[in-house]
Amino acid sequence: MELLPREKDKLLVFTAALLAERRLNRGLKLNYPEAMAFITMEIIEGARDGKTVAELMAYGKTLLSAEQVMDGVVELIHEVQVEATFPDGTKLVTVHNPIN
């Protein structure tokens, strides 16, 4: 199977997000890459489910709390930008201050 670089990147993010989800379920705090991957995957999957850009921008702020990430991660993530595929095309979703 041949995958484009963009498709490989999406699979890598998805794999990291699954690991992050498992760690969250075990009560572990996420590090920076895990938190970014988790938020990114949820936005991509939300777009696939038919949510709007505005809905995903709001949803992205509800995914993680400061208690769910390691010290310093909140200060590192000021915004998350994701190119997601919607039913009407690819759009950029930006979530400002995603971890409360």
Swiss-Prot record:
E.C. numbers: 3.5.1.5
SUPFAM superfamilies: Urease, gamma-subunit (SSF54111)
GO cellular component: cytoplasm
Catalytic activity: urea + 2 H2O + H(+) = hydrogencarbonate + 2 NH4(+)
GO molecular function terms noted in the UniProt entry: nickel cation binding; urease activity
Keyword NAD among UniProt keywords: no
GO biological process, one term: urea catabolic process
Record has Cytoplasm as a keyword: yes
Pathway given in the UniProt record: Nitrogen metabolism; urea degradation; CO(2) and NH(3) from urea (urease route): step 1/1
Pfam families found in the cross-reference section: Urease_gamma
Gene3D superfamilies: Urease, gamma-like subunit
Keywords in alphabetical order: Cytoplasm, Hydrolase
Main location: cytoplasm
Subcellular locations according to the entry: Cytoplasm
Similarity comment: Belongs to the urease gamma subunit family.
PANTHER family found in the cross-reference section: UREASE
Subunit structure: Heterotrimer of UreA (gamma), UreB (beta) and UreC (alpha) subunits. Three heterotrimers associate to form the active enzyme.
Protein name: Urease subunit gamma
Species of origin: Marinomonas sp. (strain MWYL1)
